[in-house]
Amino acid sequence: MLANVIEGFAMLDERSRAAELYPLALELISTGAVSLWTSARLTQTVAGIAAAAAHNWEAAEDHFQTALNQAESFPSLLEQAEIRRFHAMMLIDRATPGDRKTARTLLSEALETYTQIGMPRHIEMTQNLLD
């Protein structure tokens, strides 16, 4: 349930509320949990979303990279696309030099996967981020 709450707050632009849950996301990772059966979301993805909401950019980058490595090793195409989209959202928020270009690359890769899988709502969300 924690993953759904963090992701929900992030998507509803309630980032401060998602950020408050970052310590719980770290606690979840410390249990050794890698994937959540209720959502198939990786715990590192959840922590990345919460860290990004807290503007803890370095931690978010680390979580997203770890999550992407895990998603590629499983492999989980959907989670790879989701990680790329959430990572891109973080980069757009951070807005340091080069972030927008990297975000566009990540979003383009996510868009390709969403199109391949057939996820119209995710295609729309990703296209909106690209605009």
Regions found by a protein language model. Give the residues of each.
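Helix-coil-helix junctions within alpha-helical repeat/solenoid scaffolds
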Residues: 1-131
